[in-house]
Structure formats: C-alpha cells, structure tokens
C-alpha cells in the first residue's frame, strides 16, 4: 500500500522534464545517415544475399518436394513388392514343386529301367545256368552211356569182333 501512495505522489509532481526533441531528432538523423551509408556501400550485396538466400530456399524446397515424390514412389513400389511377395513365394514354391515332381518322375523312370534291365539280366543268367546244367548233365549222361556201352560191348563182343567194329567206324570217319 505504501508503494501505491508513493507512486501517486511522484505522478502528481511536475518535474519539468519532457521529451528532448532535439536529442531525438539528432538520433533519427544519425540513424538515417548511417543506414544510407550502409545502403550505398553494401546495398547490392545485402539485396543479393537475401535474393540468393530466397532462391536457395526455394531451390531447396523444390529439391525436397522432388525427393518427397521419389520417396512416395519408392514406398509405393516397396508396398507393391510386399503385396506381391506372397504370390511370388507361392509361384516359387509351385515351381520348385514342379521341378521336384519332374526329378521324382525321372528317378522313378530310371529305377524302373534299371529294375527291368536287372530282371532281364537275371533271366539271361538263369537261362545260361540252366543251359550249362543241361549241357553238364548231357555230358555226364554221355560219359555214363559210353561207359555202359563199353561194358555191354565188352560183355557181348569178342576181341576179334571189337577190332572189326573199330576198323569199320574209323573207315567211315576218315572217308567222311
């Protein structure tokens, strides 16, 4: 409250000080001269600086807008790829399955051919073994027949008849 009354006391007093218009005019003239000198000396550079700065900002904004547009295009491309990723995955899997089925069919075909070749070879081997066994049996039977025939001839033929029979067959063999 004391401050309130003190401010009223000071406000009511006439101190006789008013604005010093001469000093103010001197300051304004001084500022105008100083601004004129600066404008005369560096006005074009200042204007060029602000104009260049303005153009630089405009160019930077245009570049940023271009980059923003390119980024949107790239984002759309990436989103499209992501959307197509599942279909691409399905296509790749289908391709690998088809290749697998082809390889499987080729392996089965090769195995069947090998099995048929092995079966055919086993049949030939069995046939050859049967023929060899039959030939061996025939040879053994021929030997046994010869032994039996010799025994029978030895019992029924005399030595003189035996000699005649040998000469007869030797003559046939030599003449033929």
UniProtKB/Swiss-Prot annotation:
Identification of the protein by name: ATP synthase subunit b
Topology versus the membrane: Single-pass membrane protein
Compartmental location: Cell inner membrane
Family to which this protein belongs: Belongs to the ATPase B chain family.
Membrane-crossing residue ranges in chain numbering: 24-43
Pfam families, A to Z: ATP-synt_B
Purpose of the protein: F(1)F(0) ATP synthase produces ATP from ADP in the presence of a proton or sodium gradient. F-type ATPases consist of two structural domains, F(1) containing the extramembraneous catalytic core and F(0) containing the membrane proton channel, linked together by a central stalk and a peripheral stalk. During catalysis, ATP synthesis in the catalytic domain of F(1) is coupled via a rotary mechanism of the central stalk subunits to proton translocation.
Organism: Nitratidesulfovibrio vulgaris (strain ATCC 29579 / DSM 644 / CCUG 34227 / NCIMB 8303 / VKM B-1760 / Hildenborough) (Desulfovibrio vulgaris)
CDD domains linked to this entry: ATP-synt_Fo_b
GO molecular function (one): proton-transporting ATPase activity, rotational mechanism
Primary location: membrane
GO cellular component: plasma membrane; proton-transporting ATP synthase complex
Keyword flag Transmembrane helix: yes
Keyword field contains Cell inner membrane: yes
PANTHER family: ATP SYNTHASE SUBUNIT B (PTHR33445:SF1), ATP SYNTHASE SUBUNIT B', CHLOROPLASTIC (PTHR33445)
Subunit structure: F-type ATPases have 2 components, F(1) - the catalytic core - and F(0) - the membrane proton channel. F(1) has five subunits: alpha(3), beta(3), gamma(1), delta(1), epsilon(1). F(0) has three main subunits: a(1), b(2) and c(10-14). The alpha and beta chains form an alternating ring which encloses part of the gamma chain. F(1) is attached to F(0) by a central stalk formed by the gamma and epsilon chains, while a peripheral stalk is formed by the delta and b chains.
Keywords linked to the UniProt accession: ATP synthesis, Cell inner membrane, Cell membrane, CF(0), Hydrogen ion transport, Ion transport, Membrane, Transmembrane, Transmembrane helix, Transport
């Amino acid at each position: 409250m004391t401050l309130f009354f003190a401010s009223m006391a000071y406000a009511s007093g006439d101190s006789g000080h008013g604005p010093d218009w001469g000093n103010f005019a001197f300051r304004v003239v001084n500022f105008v001269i100083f601004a004129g000198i600066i404008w005369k000396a560096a006005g074009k550079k200042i204007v060029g600086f602000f104009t260049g700065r303005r153009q630089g900002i405009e160019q930077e904004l245009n570049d940023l807008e271009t980059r923003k547009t390119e980024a949107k295009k790239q984002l759309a491309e990436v989103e499209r790829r992501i959307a197509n990723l599942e279909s691409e995955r399905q296509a790749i899997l289908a391709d690998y399955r088809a290749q697998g089925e082809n390889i499987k069919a080729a392996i089965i075909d090769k195995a069947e051919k090998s099995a048929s070749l092995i079966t055919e070879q086993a049949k030939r081997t069995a046939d050859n073994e049967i023929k060899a066994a039959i030939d061996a049996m025939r040879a053994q039977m021929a030997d046994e027949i010869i032994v039996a025939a010799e025994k029978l001839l030895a019992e029924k033929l005399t030595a003189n008849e035996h000699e005649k029979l040998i000469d007869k067959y030797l003559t046939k063999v030599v003449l033929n």
